[in-house]
């Protein structure tokens, strides 16, 4: 950040007002994405992003987040503090303007912030509007100021309450339970975002403290993040369990046409592309022009180097852009003065000029790296050739999947017991472990809207398999065909084509034992790597069959955990010395059709767990660790999470 920008005065005059706040409570999803878990956590990100803006401007080094015991959130920073002087146009404190007017903030005054992710004032005023209670405290100019709000309305004027030798802003808010589906914060979700921010902003101290939970030492559970390595460290974290084929992470940063570009990348022995893109610290899940620019620059530069070095002379088929990205893990971070995001939740960058800026930056810096590191360059090109060879084989296998799919009209898998309903939004398919359990499920289901596809044994571990092996696997081919999806769209020959998807509920149903959990994980890994769009759209679920059946005469009750079993046994005994029959279900096949319907299939009674991806970064890391080749990280993960496991006696 330039000294000119760093020293720019940040006062009430810098706060610009664009529009009012009335619409936020009426249509919250327009501003924070949704009113579920994602939107709830988005409130925290908006407040934290304001503190990050201060850090980007060179005025903040510590940001601390607290989940309080009542599920309210406190975010503190040691930045300059939101201005409290009288706003000339509004005639009231700039702090009140920032907290109560949408699009009011220093972000819109280029002198205050060169770039900004969280829209300073937009985010925090949205948070205020969607909170039942909010309190802001500002330490600035040797004084402490405060103001409190209820559903966005000030309860009194900004007031001075003391003196201080610190600077910073402290915000505490409680999400409005009348707006959000639930108001319980998830420590792991917030932790993943703060870790991400620490990598993207090296040298900044971030912490998360959960005042609802005490650790083994009697202290509040706390996570602290600071990264000195930045994006290089981020890529190593993402790639922790994969085998790198290069001797170090490739890193470069620079600026082109006023767009600062930072890239860290490495190639590994896996077969998947794992690229994460950010604009002003915002995770752009859907990519955008910066990602397009990166891919264009990468492909063009590697292709030119490979052609000039003569390494492609013996390759008899065309190499595609995808081949240059197989086994690539990369993080791209750009800073854009006036970002144009497609969609209110900022997930796709639309600035056309960024494509050329990023493409040129990547080309220039990667060309230099390849010339300076010929041995590493040759390893990358050999990886590309291997990817192209495998893709050629995979294309034939994919074509088999497409030919066998419902789109070609050649029929559905013989093992599929389909439903009669044809509206996908009303249909559900159960992927059932084994033929015997599949038989029970077929008898117990509602044939009108429930389909059953039995899967034989453990499906292929796609994390360790080349693409053509995946598409040649019989069980996987059956899943593609039964679901009605295929590979390849007009825009991308490798993209999932969901135009003919036949079910909007895809339910994984396996035994409630270790083997069943392993099979469910294999299926989830397949969905994450090859049908991720179904997960992102909320179409993938996990069934929860009961673990126990308790019997006392004609009284029969099901329970889903050991704790629930113990409570029910005590309740059914009623203080008397009577025997309670306990049946442990180790497999779905041990239940008859009626029991399976009552507990697991009946929409009125069952519990389905929807599979979601709160953090693509964390999901990728966990799948790679659980299903990859490295044993020590997997063992450490299992030991750390052993308390959540169900162990069969």
Regions inferred by a protein language model and the residue ranges of each:
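GHKL-family ATPase ATP-binding module
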Residues: 1-14, 21, 45, 53-55, ...
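Helical (often loop-to-helix) elements that flank the catalytic cores of nucleotide-handling enzymes
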Residues: 88, 342-354, 558-564, 568
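Conserved short strand/loop->alpha-helix "switch" segment adjacent to the catalytic nucleotide/phosphoryl-transfer site
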Residues: 26-45
């Amino acid at each position: 950040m330039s000294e000119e920008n760093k020293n720019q005065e940040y006062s009430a005059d810098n706060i610009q007002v664009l529009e009012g706040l009335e619409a936020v409570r009426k249509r919250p999803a327009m501003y924070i994405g949704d009113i579920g878990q994602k939107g709830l956590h988005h409130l925290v990100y908006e407040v934290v992003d304001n503190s990050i803006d201060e850090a980007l401007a060179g005025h903040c080094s510590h940001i601390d987040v607290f989940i309080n015991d009542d599920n309210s959130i406190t975010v503190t920073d040691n930045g300059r503090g939101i201005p409290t002087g009288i706003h000339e146009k509004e005639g009231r404190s700039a702090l009140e303007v920032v907290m109560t007017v949408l699009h009011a903030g220093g972000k819109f005054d280029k002198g205050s912030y060169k770039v900004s992710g969280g829209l300073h004032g937009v985010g925090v005023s949205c948070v205020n509007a969607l909170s039942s209670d909010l309190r802001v405290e500002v330490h600035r100019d040797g004084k402490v100021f405060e103001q409190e709000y209820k559903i966005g309305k000030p309860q009194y004027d900004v007031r001075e309450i003391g003196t201080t030798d610190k600077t910073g802003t402290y915000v505490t808010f409680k999400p409005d339970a009348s707006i959000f589906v639930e108001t319980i914060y998830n420590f792991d979700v917030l932790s993943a975002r703060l870790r991400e921010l620490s990598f993207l902003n090296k040298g900044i101290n971030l912490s998360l403290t959960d005042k609802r939970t005490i650790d083994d030492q009697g202290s509040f559970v706390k996570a602290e993040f600071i990264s000195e390595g930045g994006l290089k460290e981020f890529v190593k974290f993402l790639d922790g369990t994969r085998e790198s084929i290069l001797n170090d992470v490739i890193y470069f940063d620079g600026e082109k046409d006023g767009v600062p570009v930072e890239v860290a990348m490495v190639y590994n022995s896996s077969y998947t592309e794992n690229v994460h893109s950010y604009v002003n610290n915002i995770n752009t899940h859907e990519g955008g022009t910066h990602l397009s620019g990166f891919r264009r620059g990468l492909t063009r530069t590697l292709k030119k180097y490979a052609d000039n070095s003569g390494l492609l002379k013996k390759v008899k088929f065309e190499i595609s852009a995808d081949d240059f990205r197989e086994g690539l893990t990369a993080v791209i971070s750009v800073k854009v003065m006036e970002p144009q995001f497609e969609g209110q939740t900022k997930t796709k960058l639309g600035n056309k000029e960024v494509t050329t800026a990023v493409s040129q930056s990547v080309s220039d810096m990667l060309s230099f790296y390849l010339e300076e590191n010929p041995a590493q360059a040759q390893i990358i090109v050999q990886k590309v050739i291997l990817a192209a060879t495998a893709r050629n084989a995979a294309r034939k296998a994919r074509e088999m999947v497409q030919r066998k799919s419902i789109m070609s009209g050649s029929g559905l898998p013989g093992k599929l017991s389909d439903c009669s309903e044809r509206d996908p939004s009303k249909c559900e398919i159960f992927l059932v472990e084994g033929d015997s359990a599949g038989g029970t499920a077929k008898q117990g289901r509602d044939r009108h809207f429930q389909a059953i596809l039995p899967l034989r044994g453990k499906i292929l571990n796609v994390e360790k398999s080349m693409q053509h092996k995946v598409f040649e696997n019989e069980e996987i081919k059956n899943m593609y065909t039964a679901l009605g999806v295929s590979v390849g769209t007009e825009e991308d020959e490798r993209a999932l084509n969901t135009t003919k998807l036949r079910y909007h509920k895809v339910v994984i149903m396996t035994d409630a034992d270790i083997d069943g959990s392993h099979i469910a994980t294999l299926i989830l890994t397949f969905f994450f790597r090859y049908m991720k769009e179904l997960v992102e759209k909320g179409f993938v679920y996990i069934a929860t069959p009961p673990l126990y059946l308790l019997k006392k005469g004609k009284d029969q009750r099901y329970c889903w955990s050991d704790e629930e079993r113990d409570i029910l046994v005590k309740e059914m005994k009623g203080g008397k010395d009577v025997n309670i029959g306990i049946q442990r279900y180790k497999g779905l096949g041990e239940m008859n059709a009626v029991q399976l319907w009552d507990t697991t299939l009946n929409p009125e009674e069952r519990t389905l767990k929807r599979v979601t991806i709160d953090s693509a970064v964390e999901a990728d890391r966990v799948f790679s660790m659980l299903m990859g080749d490295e044993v020590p990280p997997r063992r450490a993960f299992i030991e750390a999470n052993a308390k959540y496991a169900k162990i069969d006696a």
